[in-house]
Amino acid sequence: MTIEVKFENHGTQLTGVVRRPGGDGPHPAVAFVDGSGPAERDSFDEEADVLARAGFASLAWDKPGCGGSGGDWRDQSLQDRAAEALAAVDCLAGQDGVDPGRIALLGASQGGWVGPLAASMSATVAAVISLSGSGVSPYAQEVYRVEHMLRDAGVAEDQVAEALAFFHRRATRLRRGDDLEEVLADQLRHQDATWYPALGDDGVVEHLAFMARIYDYDPAPALERVTCPVLAIWGERDIYVPVAASAERFAAALGRAGNGSFRLEVVAGADHGLRLPPTGGDGRGPRIPDLMDMVTTWLRRALPPAPDPA
């Protein structure tokens, strides 16, 4: 069963869809947190269907400025995104048949920063799942991504060095608050360079403003305050996220939190989308076959039903 819902975060109206499994409940539930860029509620359709068959309700929503939601995601900080995720948890908690004490956040990519941050802000988050989430800052991740994307594409080392030099120079200007139109004009002068597409932005000042806002976010302090169960999964072949460093930082920070209920998994052969190497001509490999089985099995243990009163 699916129903359209509306909820608010700091005056911005957001629209999404709740999926409920059969039966009266109360059911555990999952709120999905998208990664970077624009995204609508259908981003997690496959995962929501699997969870519904396993007895979980879920909520996916249009990011600000996408689909039926107001606002603009590029105006947000990661703290704003975390507040939005908590508003989604509150929306789920108010749905018929949902157990408000058993709601998890599942964040993918950039959502892997948002989920733990939200959990560090509110006990309403009962568990956190991070899929390909980074344990380093957005700036450090972007340096890693640009370098590894270019090398993976076979770009010459002098071009890789030129790209990284520009990236560092642009970051310095963004940090000190230089005029964004001037920063963008300087960037666009390089748009014919071999390395330019690896910058991965849409060439508008709004995106530069968003990056400047989040560049130096350190996920460790939030992770150090997360005491609910955490599942983090990475792909060994991820060229977007430094997997070894991320897993190490997750483990250290959650250890400092005294969190005894976390599980960290690195899947051999998988990429950032948790897909295996492609076998067909479309260049897109299959999803890890047992990914959602792993997630649902873990969720059942992390969100057990309350014991019947004696």
Which residues does each predicted region cover?
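Alpha/beta-hydrolase active-site loop
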Residues: Q76-D96
